[in-house]
């Protein structure tokens, strides 16, 4: 006999049939007599009509819940948002962020190339940390080149192999893509310059961003408005970096990465927080115009307007609720009575129209060892399951 309780469901005694207890989960008889719940995951919304981006994906990465979606699986050139993967591969292969790296002639970019850069010179000596800031703030293609060559060389050395260090780095980028289970992403360079075989999707770029921003050094660099350091080497000088993400500090945005090419349009990835949850928002192919010299015209750049519109719509159309007594009175006490706890206590994101009529049902199986899953917390709006949380046995081993 198991006792399951939930506000508005009342107290129910269940005599559990053997084939049900085999799964350790049961359903309240008061629910069993009603119509079956609707699907538990709501569909992401279409972005507002004034958003110009060709592809959009917004996801609560903590809850794993998509919020907005437009052509999320369309392969597109990501421009310099590529550098999120570059940064991730660097981080995955770095233990000492103060390790010194020397720039070579192959890394130098000229202003006439119309490439973003930090202005390094051959012979300049940087720490990996400094180059990470150059990668994430100024979107320096020269910083990407130095890092790719350095990390690629380390990988070759560790393998006892020879070859082109930059090519080895690109192999590692695509190996990381495969390890993340991404099927519509492929890279041919570390900086994002256009190539028809260099692509990702809004959905998969959001996955890459979530992985990258989970690295403290990447998140810290991406969240800095400015950064200043002095180079070492034959031409010591002060380098001042400025973040290209104009949304930093606005609308809750705490980090981000821009990218722009004629072939890509204006691209932007941002990280923001809602009730402790991390939200990743991606726009690819926002409107932007270029002059006769193929220089972007900032006054025509719509990516920041697109992102602001998405965030504004998000805060109106969704609500974040905590699985505790504030939003679910009595839940904490009931968990204590049964000596169980939630295995996941992050905020639940719901459509705004669902957030005002919530109730819960605690499904429990027999007691088990501490930290073993013994049930599920179901969150309902009407008869629709809108969220689930694992319930674990409390106590100590």
PLM region spans:
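Hydrophobic alpha-helical transmembrane segments of integral membrane proteins
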Residues: 15-17, 80, 252
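Alpha-helical transmembrane segments of integral membrane proteins
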Residues: 8, 12-15
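Active-site-adjacent loops and short helices of periplasmic peptidoglycan-processing enzymes
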Residues: 32-203, 209-216
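N-terminal secretory signal peptides that target proteins for export/translocation
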Residues: 1-8
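Domain-terminus/edge residues, biased toward the C-terminal soluble/receptor-binding domains
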Residues: 194-199, 203-204, 209-397
């Amino acid at each position: 006999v198991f006792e399951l309780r939930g506000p508005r469901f009342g107290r129910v005694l269940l005599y559990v049939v053997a084939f049900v207890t085999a799964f350790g989960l049961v359903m309240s008889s008061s629910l069993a007599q009603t119509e079956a719940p609707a699907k538990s995951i709501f569909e992401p919304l279409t972005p507002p009509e004034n958003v110009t981006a060709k592809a959009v994906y917004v996801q609560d990465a903590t809850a794993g819940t998509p919020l907005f979606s437009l052509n999320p699986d369309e392969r597109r050139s990501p421009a310099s948002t590529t550098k999120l993967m570059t940064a991730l591969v660097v981080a995955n292969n770095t233990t000492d962020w103060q390790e010194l790296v020397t720039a070579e002639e192959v890394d130098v970019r000229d202003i006439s190339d119309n490439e973003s850069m930090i202005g390094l010179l051959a012979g300049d000596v940087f720490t990996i940390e400094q180059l990470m800031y150059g990668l994430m703030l100024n979107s320096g293609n020269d910083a990407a080149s130095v890092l790719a060559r350095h990390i690629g060389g380390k990988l070759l050395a560790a393998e006892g192999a020879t070859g082109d260090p930059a090519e080895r780095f690109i192999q590692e980028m695509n190996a990381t893509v495969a390890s993340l289970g991404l099927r519509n992403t492929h890279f041919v360079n570390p900086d994002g310059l256009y190539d028809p075989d260099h692509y990702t999707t809004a959905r998969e770029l959001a996955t890459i961003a979530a992985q990258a921003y989970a690295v403290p050094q990447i998140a810290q660099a991406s969240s800095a408005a400015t950064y200043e350091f002095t180079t070492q080497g034959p031409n010591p000088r002060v380098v001042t970096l400025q973040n290209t993400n104009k949304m930093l500090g606005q609308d809750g945005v705490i980090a981000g990465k821009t990218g722009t090419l004629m072939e890509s349009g204006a691209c932007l990835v941002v990280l923001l927080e809602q009730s402790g949850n991390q939200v990743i928002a991606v726009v690819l192919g926002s409107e932007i115009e270029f002059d006769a010299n193929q220089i972007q015209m900032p006054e025509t750049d719509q990516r920041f307007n697109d992102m602001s519109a998405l965030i504004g719509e998000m805060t109106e159309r969704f609500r974040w609720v905590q699985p505790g007594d504030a939003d679910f009175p009595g839940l904490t006490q009931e968990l204590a009575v049964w000596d169980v706890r939630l295995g996941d206590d992050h905020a639940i994101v719901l459509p705004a129209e669902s957030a005002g009529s919530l109730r819960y049902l605690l499904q429990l199986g027999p007691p088990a060892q501490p930290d073993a899953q013994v049930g599920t917390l179901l969150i309902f709006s009407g008869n629709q399951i809108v969220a689930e949380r694992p319930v674990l046995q409390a106590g100590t081993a």
